[in-house]
């Protein structure tokens, strides 16, 4: 009997878990795929574990909860108690048939799903200490040292860790002492294929050949995604381009500014309409583990203006597919926006360059090929040394 592949996930992970599941089905088609959802199949089936963990949240994070620097929900998966319970429960659940599995793979790094005796891999978009790379990060929001030690075990219990970006790879090495050859950046792709009925197909642009001077901001977290800074930059843009428009999709900030259009939340099916209407895409985010929304902007051949932090330098090629700047420097941001609004040809060139980046690197087929080849190589090494 052929061995199975074990896939451990939690929820949808913004549809990333669907995309990764498809990768495993495609790349390891000769093996049955078994899926365990940590929330639905493990924690929800153990009420005692759930309630004990709420007590653990209070024990570890009471000062932060009282000061409101952290929310109970954010802390729930960051207690040593839940970390150990997940790890131990999975080990007990599968101990008797661990020989049935070729390997296991988990997405995200909020729990240790490794099982002794099964080669284990991790695919993640962040580490907690990646936040140290962001100048605006509030260190009072750091989770407990005890939990960070549990997080360290996640990476060290894996045969290999795969990251969506190079700065997260560097964090694994610098902050968690993961050997360089045990962590690899494989990037990520757009999840619109599974999140929408239109299968992620880009809508033809409706921006009058990049001449309509519309800037799109698409994001749910207005503050974290740099919305206030964009408004400040946009006011400066209006001094040179009084007909420019800024469309805000995904959130509803209260802002008094000319030509500032709040669209708010829209169904996922309609998000591509707002990419299609834009000439420029701008989200000057202050924190960005990866940023799939920028991949989707490139899928629509839009030039991007964003921040020079996190994963953005690996997504946006400075001066070729977009412009990057310090997210707090609104004067430079305004200049970059004006440069694009004044040159439809530059917009077209940047958009085409970004589109090629998606076709060649930032797509799930490329991610799947790279990850699967690496997993096979690691397994060959493990099994050959065992024999």
Question: Where are these predicted regions, by residue range?
Answer:
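Membrane-proximal helix-turn-helix segments that form the acceptor-binding/catalytic region
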Residues: 141-161
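Carbohydrate-associated surface elements
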Residues: 167, 189
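Short alpha-helical donor nucleotide-sugar binding micro-motif in glycosyltransferases
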Residues: 266, 273-278
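Aromatic "clamp/platform" in nucleotide-sugar-dependent glycosyltransferases that forms part
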Residues: 286
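Short hydrophobic beta-strand element within catalytic cores of glycosyltransferases
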Residues: 303-306, 316
């Amino acid at each position: 009997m052929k061995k199975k592949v074990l896939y451990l996930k939690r929820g949808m992970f913004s549809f990333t878990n669907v995309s990764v599941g498809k990768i495993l089905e495609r790349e390891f088609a000769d093996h049955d795929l078994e899926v365990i959802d940590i929330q639905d199949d493990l924690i929800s089936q153990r009420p005692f574990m759930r309630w004990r963990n709420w007590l653990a949240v209070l024990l570890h994070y009471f000062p932060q909860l009282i000061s409101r620097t952290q929310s109970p929900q954010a802390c729930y998966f960051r207690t040593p108690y839940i970390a150990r319970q997940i790890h131990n429960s999975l080990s007990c659940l599968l101990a008797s048939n661990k020989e049935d599995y070729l390997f296991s793979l988990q997405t995200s790094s909020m729990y240790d799903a490794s099982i002794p005796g099964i080669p284990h891999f991790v695919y993640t978009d962040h580490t907690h200490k990646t936040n140290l790379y962001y100048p605006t990060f509030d260190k009072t929001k750091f989770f407990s040292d005890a939990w960070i030690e549990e997080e360290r075990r996640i990476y060290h219990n894996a045969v290999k860790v795969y990251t969506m970006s190079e700065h997260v790879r560097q964090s694994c090495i610098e902050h968690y002492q993961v050997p360089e050859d045990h962590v690899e950046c494989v990037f990520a792709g757009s999840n619109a294929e599974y999140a929408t009925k239109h299968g992620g197909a880009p809508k033809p642009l409706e921006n009058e050949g990049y001449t309509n001077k519309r800037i799109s901001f698409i994001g749910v977290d207005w503050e974290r995604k740099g919305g206030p800074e964009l408004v400040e930059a946009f006011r400066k843009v209006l001094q040179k381009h009084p007909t420019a428009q800024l469309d805000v999709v995904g959130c509803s900030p209260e802002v008094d500014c000319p030509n500032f259009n709040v669209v708010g939340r829209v169904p996922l099916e309609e998000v591509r309409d707002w990419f299609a209407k834009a000439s420029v895409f701008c989200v000057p985010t202050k924190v960005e583990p990866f940023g799939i929304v920028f991949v989707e902007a490139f899928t629509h051949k839009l030039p991007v203006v964003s921040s020079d932090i996190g994963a953005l330098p690996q997504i946006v090629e400075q001066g070729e597919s977009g412009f990057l700047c310090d997210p707090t420097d609104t004067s430079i941001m305004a200049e970059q926006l004006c440069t694009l609004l004044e040159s439809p040809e530059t917009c077209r060139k940047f958009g085409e360059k970004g589109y090629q980046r998606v076709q060649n690197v930032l797509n799930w087929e490329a991610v799947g090929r790279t990850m699967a080849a690496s997993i096979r190589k690691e397994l060959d090494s493990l099994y050959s040394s065992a024999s």
